[in-house]
């Protein structure tokens, strides 16, 4: 199974909607899962609220390992998880983008510089 995941803390909703539209158009084979703050365990959120409440990175990206752990509990062996930050979107089918590279690799990571000058 193919999963496309994204995190929405409410600060980039317009960009996330554009990203999700592009996934629905160009990645029809993906099951889309949108995580948000309510997916962070309450105990963890309370303990690290001083970080998670900071605006940069939705709390300095502290939510990423939490959501990675959650998605890994959902997926099965050989499933594919595709994650993209909200500032990006697809303009064409991206099946070849991952299929070609996944033949010889278990994990793919791309490095992109966000369009936002503050990062």
Predicted regions and their residues:
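Glycosyltransferase catalytic domains, chiefly GT-A lineage
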Residues: 1-119
């Amino acid at each position: 199974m193919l999963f496309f995941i994204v995190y929405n803390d409410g600060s980039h909703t317009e960009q996330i909607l554009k990203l999700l539209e592009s996934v629905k158009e160009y990645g029809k084979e993906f099951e889309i899962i949108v995580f948000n703050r309510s997916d962070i365990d309450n105990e963890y959120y309370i303990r690290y609220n001083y970080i998670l409440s900071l605006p940069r990175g939705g709390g300095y990206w502290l939510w990423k390992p939490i959501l990675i752990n959650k998605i890994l509990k959902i997926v099965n062996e050989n499933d594919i998880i595709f994650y993209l930050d909200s500032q990006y979107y697809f303009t064409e089918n991206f099946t070849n983008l991952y299929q070609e590279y996944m033949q010889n690799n278990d994990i793919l990571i791309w490095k992109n510089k966000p369009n936002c000058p503050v990062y």
